[in-house]
Curated annotation (Swiss-Prot):
HAMAP family linked: GcvT
One Gene Ontology cellular component: glycine cleavage complex
Subunit structure: The glycine cleavage system is composed of four proteins: P, T, L and H.
Membrane-crossing segments per the record: none
Keyword Transferase appears in the UniProt entry: yes
Disulfide bonds: none
Lineage, opening ranks: Bacteria, Pseudomonadati, Bacteroidota, Bacteroidia, Bacteroidales
Protein name: Aminomethyltransferase
EC class: transferase
Keywords: Aminotransferase, Transferase
Molecular function as annotated in GO: aminomethyltransferase activity; transaminase activity
Name of the coding gene: gcvT
Length: 361
């Protein structure tokens, strides 16, 4: 199994470790609910060094990104980040990712850990314009410091004025005595905070500084278990669950990152435009349980007559709401807010209702 600069630290802190995307990663420390509430109410630190990072450089960088991503990179100014996806030839999704406009003719792509090899091969094979590509995944580490007290803690460690970095913006500066740290106002929790990118050898110094600075605020290390419950409470999609090679961005509710603008001929554009014009047969919905029960990935969604109408893609017990919540694809007829649907849990029909995400207001 691969390791991150923090693997030994997680083990020393008593984390429950598990293989994820080929890495030995912490799933939980004090428990998922405690960690979830820590991030919502205070501040927590996630090791996300398993994520992939690709540099796209040169005079043809923008043209390349306009061909392989769904969002309009031409409108992305230097210093800002953009959520997007790689559509495949069949109208499905290769991966969802962040694009950072680092400097003129230089972009950073941050991709999902489980898809690094697939995404890299996709980019290389679709680089028909001669953009300069570099896979820096093994040369970059990443920590996400999330929660309402994140800025307060991090500001103690950098001369950069963090309050001047808007949401989905970033800067590169000194942090905890380390140079060239990318400080990004982004996250996957909905609780606010920052994501830091840095050289792996700076990892231990940065980790130590953050935990010393955050002690008065009750800072804790957080595992991937709570990362999943936090993102689900926000209705954020997870690749491999809610997004896949066979789900279209339009079905997934990602029409807002799918830009059919002039001069942007991304993979399967015509197919997705046709899908939009003809109407969708299924859509991703958010739902909360009316009956007691926890929906799980792969459970069938049925109507009142017990006929299959879709499938749960993500589900959990919401630590904040203390009810079962989930997402799943259903036939379009069942997507209106307030629609009653049922989860087939081992032959029992449990009632749920279609709601608007996020679940955590």
């Amino acid at each position: 199994m691969k390791t991150t600069p923090f693997t030994e630290t997680h083990i020393a802190l008593g984390a429950k470790m598990h293989e994820f995307a080929g890495y030995n990663m912490p799933i939980e420390y004090s428990g998922i609910i405690d960690e979830h509430l820590t991030v919502c109410n205070a501040v927590g630190v996630f090791d996300v060094s398993h994520m992939g990072e690709f540099w796209v450089k040169g005079p043809n960088a923008l043209e390349f990104l306009q061909q392989v991503t769904s969002n309009n990179v031409a409108t992305l100014p230097v210093g800002k980040a953009q959520y997007t996806c790689f559509p495949n030839e069949e109208g499905g999704i290769v991966d969802d990712l962040l694009v950072y406009h680092y400097e003129s003719e230089k972009y950073l792509l941050v991709v999902n850990a489980a898809n690094i090899e697939k995404d890299w091969n996709w980019c290389v094979s679709h680089n028909t314009v001669g953009a300069e590509l570099e896979n820096a995944s093994d040369r970059m580490a990443q920590l996400a410091i999330q929660g309402p007290k994140a800025m307060e803690v991090l500001q103690k460690l950098t001369p950069v004025n963090l309050s001047e970095i808007p949401y989905y913006a970033f800067t590169t500066g000194e942090f905890a005595g380390q140079k060239d740290v990318i400080i990004s106002n982004t996250g996957y929790t909905g609780a606010g905070g920052f994501e830091l990118y840095f050289y792996p050898e700076a990892g231990q110094a940065i980790w130590k500084a953050i935990f010393e600075a955050g002690a008065p605020e009750g800072i804790k290390p957080i595992g991937l278990g709570a990362r999943d419950t936090l993102r689900l409470e926000m209705g954020f999609c997870l690749y491999g669950n809610d997004l896949s090679d066979t789900t279209s961005p339009l079905e997934a509710g990602l029409g807002w990152i799918t830009k059919f603008v002039e001069g942007k001929n991304f993979t399967s554009r015509a197919l997705l435009e046709k899908q939009k014009a003809e109407g969708l047969k299924r859509k991703l919905i958010a739902f909360e349980m009316v009956d007691r029960g926890i929906p799980r990935h792969g459970y069938e969604l049925v109507n009142a007559d017990g006929e299959k109408i879709g499938e749960v893609t993500s589900g959990t017990m919401s630590p904040m709401r203390k009810i079962g919540i989930g997402m799943g694809y259903v036939q379009t007829a069942y997507t209106a807010l307030g629609t009653e649907i049922f989860i087939d849990v081992r032959g029992r029909k449990l009632k749920a209702v279609v709601v608007k995400a996020p679940f955590r207001k």
